[in-house]
């Protein structure tokens, strides 16, 4: 358990389909599809993936100008792409923002997640398609996050990190009671996504204020990801230099 991390370092469709990353069999057809899929990142995508953020849950009315206004607060932007439908031209609700400097990227990653833009609370993460080994997109049954209503939640990302597996010690005097409690906890863990706030607060706060009171999910792990990000970036730069 010492090597356990709430954020996946490598994408595994089977683990992503499990709230604690311990499933041994796929629980839905989408996971099967992702396990069988072979995905190659789009080589036509330009820009440095290690300086690019993924911004999602945008209002369909939010324009490029608004995103540039908000995200330029953290540093100079090199490239901004709001993804649109090729036929209708309407926004698909997500964008990619490339910064000129790593410092700006990290600041935006820490501070922009959860901001409200045009009445929508946005989600911010690093680009994963070109940086997370083994990545499988949502359309092939993979991805991360998702809505509970869809029945296809994917764990191991910033939005829905893995929950630490439950390993409760067995009490010799009360073996049956302990076993029932463990089963109850495991059953509950399948039905809800983990929230770091104390449970009693959930009853005291309205859903409309969730974005204001939300605690950062595993903030200490964000710092770990930043260190890993810098190490990976250095390795990538070295490979590029050697290939020249």
UniProtKB/Swiss-Prot annotation:
Domain RRM residues, every copy: 51-129
Cross-link annotation Glycyl lysine isopeptide (Lys-Gly) (interchain with G-Cter in SUMO2), location: 172
Subcellular compartments: Nucleus
Disordered, as annotated region: 146-244
Basic and acidic residues bias (residue ranges): 146-162, 173-185, 192-244
Cellular component GO terms held in the UniProt record: nucleus; U12-type spliceosomal complex
SMART domains on file: RRM (SM00360)
Gene Ontology biological process terms, A to Z: mRNA splicing, via spliceosome
Family matches, as InterPro entries: Nucleotide-bd_a/b_plait_sf, RBD_domain_sf, RRM_dom, snRNP35_RRM, U1_U11-U12_snRNP_70-35kDa
Record key words, sorted: Isopeptide bond, mRNA processing, mRNA splicing, Nucleus, RNA-binding, Spliceosome, Ubl conjugation
A molecular-function term among this protein's GO annotations: snRNA binding
Quaternary assembly: Component of the U11/U12 snRNPs that are part of the U12-type spliceosome.
Name used for this protein in its record: U11/U12 small nuclear ribonucleoprotein 35 kDa protein
Gene, per the UniProt record: Snrnp35
């Amino acid at each position: 358990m010492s090597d356990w991390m709430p954020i996946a370092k490598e994408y595994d469709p089977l683990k992503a389909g499990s709230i604690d990353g311990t499933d041994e069999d796929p629980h839905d057809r989408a996971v099967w599809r992702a396990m069988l899929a072979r995905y190659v990142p789009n080589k036509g995508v330009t820009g440095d993936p290690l300086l690019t953020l993924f911004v999602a849950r945008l209002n369909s009315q939010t324009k490029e100008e608004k995103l540039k206004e908000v995200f330029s607060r953290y540093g100079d932007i090199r490239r901004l792409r709001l993804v649109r439908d090729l036929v209708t031209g309407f926004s698909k609700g997500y964008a990619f923002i490339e910064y000129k400097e790593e410092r700006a990227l990290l600041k935006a990653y820490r501070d922009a997640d959860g901001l409200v833009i045009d009445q929508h609370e946005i989600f911010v993460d690093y680009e994963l398609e070109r940086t997370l080994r083994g990545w499988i997109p949502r359309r092939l049954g993979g991805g991360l996050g998702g809505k509970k209503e869809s029945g296809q939640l994917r764990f191991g990302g910033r939005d829905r990190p893995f929950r630490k597996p439950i390993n409760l010690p067995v009490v010799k005097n009360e073996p049956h009671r302990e076993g029932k409690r463990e089963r109850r906890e495991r059953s509950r863990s399948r039905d809800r996504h983990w929230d770091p706030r104390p449970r009693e607060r959930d009853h005291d706060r309205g859903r409309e204020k969730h974005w204001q009171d939300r605690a950062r999910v595993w903030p200490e792990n964000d710092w770990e990801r930043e260190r890993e990000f810098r190490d990976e970036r250095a390795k990538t730069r070295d490979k590029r230099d050697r290939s020249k």
